[in-house]
Regions:
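N-terminal beta1-alpha1 cap of cysteine-dependent amidohydrolase-like domains
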Residues: 1-64, 74, 113-119, 145-150, ...
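Cysteine-nucleophile active-site neighborhood
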Residues: 55-128
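Amide-donor transfer/coupling interface in amidating biosynthetic enzymes
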Residues: 1-5, 113-187
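General beta-strand structural signal in soluble alpha/beta enzymes
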Residues: 31-33, 84-85, 178
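Short gly/pro-enriched beta-turn/loop segments at secondary-structure junctions
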Residues: 3-6, 42-44, 76-78, 84-85, ...
Length: 187
């Protein structure tokens, strides 16, 4: 008998708002929480899913939710499974830098993201990559960038034409993170 995967999904109106309904429906047992206002119960889950959105527009609230950020970092360090896409990946990084200042995030990934106006650059398109023998497909849409050099990827990412792109994919313990919004129904 197949084990039921208990999934906790970050969701709110903007910071973590980009969810394919088909992906949500594909998870067997789902609960939601708002990282801006709720401390998640991570004790009885098999997967934490941090989808995309616009965390850079709500940095004060995410910064003030320090207990939530700490709980997510501790969960990752204990080997908890996390899938983080775009805004979710940004949230797992060390910090997000804006024109107003630098905001510490979860600190699971040792990178900084810039959302400064001068650094804005559109990254857009369909993406695919193979990791651990599985093919992942999705799309990329963001204006934020890594501060400094783009960190190394654990696999090569390709666009719809099969051409390599510089979008990195990260694996840390049981964390999978990328700017790519994954269509997990196929994966």
């Amino acid at each position: 008998m197949e084990k039921t995967i208990r999934t906790l999904i970050a969701r709110n109106d903007e910071s973590f708002s980009f969810l394919y309904q088909e992906v949500v429906d594909s998870f067997q047992q789902v609960r939601f929480f708002d990282p801006e206002t709720e401390l998640p119960d991570l004790s009885d889950i098999d997967l934490l899913y941090l989808p995309g959105g616009y965390p850079e527009k709500h940095l004060d609230a995410l910064f003030k939710a320090e207990a939530t950020r700490r709980a997510i970092k501790d969960y990752a360090e204990r080997g908890g499974r996390i899938i983080a896409e775009c805004g979710g990946m940004m949230y797992l990084c060390e910090s997000i830098v804006t024109d107003e200042g630098e905001y510490p995030m979860c600190g699971v990934l040792p990178y900084k993201i810039t959302a400064r106006q001068a650094d804005r650059k559109l990254s857009l398109g369909y993406r695919r990559f193979i990791l651990d023998g599985k093919e992942y497909r999705g799309h990329e849409f963001h204006y934020t960038q890594f501060l400094g050099e783009t960190p190394p990827s654990v696999t090569q990412v390709y666009n719809a034409k099969g051409e390599p792109v510089a979008t990195p994919v990260f694996k840390y313990k049981n964390v999978l993170a990328s700017y790519t919004h994954l269509y997990l129904v196929e994966s």
